[in-house]
């Protein structure tokens, strides 16, 4: 076997292993949100399921976006955005803002109920479980294709409901049930569902 053939074989094995590992990460359930931003006559939104609370004091979140995307550029320029946490009734909204064929600019918001944020002006989705107004504090390159946007949560509002969840590459409505925790004093303590 030549060195170049061996390298190609290793690259194929590495790519296969990377696909397997990506499949395993799909077992991690995540909330689904739409990130929105605007700058004057320009507005954009995108569906994400890569959001996490990074710190409690100050309250900061992290959102992973594709490097060089239109939305990433808009947020870098304006430094503020809205994070709209979707309810289980908003799977069509998630699909819409994930559709690369949707109109660009403000027209993409013609098909959803939204209002302009009173301070920053960016669109916020009216039926979202939570609407968070965020200020970009840091942008960290991740690998070859993504950026981690770190943002401070400035204000927000919310409503009751069930979240839309991404699990194994599909959108789900889930019903949460609390767990019963058995006392730590019992040697056979376990946690079980009610």
UniProtKB/Swiss-Prot annotation:
Any GO MF annotation of the entry: FMN binding
Record's catalysed reaction(s): FADH2 + NADP(+) = FAD + NADPH + 2 H(+); FMNH2 + NADP(+) = FMN + NADPH + 2 H(+)
SUPFAM superfamilies per the UniProt record, alphabetical: FMN-binding split barrel (SSF50475)
EC id: 1.5.1.38
Keyword Glycoprotein in annotation: no
Disulphide linkage map: none
The keyword Membrane appears for this protein: no
Function summary: Involved in the biosynthesis of the azoxy antibiotic valanimycin, which has an antitumor activity. Catalyzes the reduction of FAD/FMN to FADH(2)/FMNH(2) which are subsequently used for the hydroxylation of isobutylamine by the isobutylamine N-hydroxylase VlmH. It can reduce either FAD or flavin mononucleotide (FMN) but prefers FAD. The enzyme has a strong preference for NADPH as acceptor.
Family of the protein in this entry: Belongs to the non-flavoprotein flavin reductase family.
Subunit and interaction comment: Homodimer. It can form an isobutylamine N-hydroxylase two component enzyme system formed of a flavin reductase component (VlmR) and a monooxygenase component (VlmH).
Name under which the protein is recorded: NADPH-flavin oxidoreductase
Species this chain originates from: Streptomyces viridifaciens
Gene name of the encoded protein: vlmR
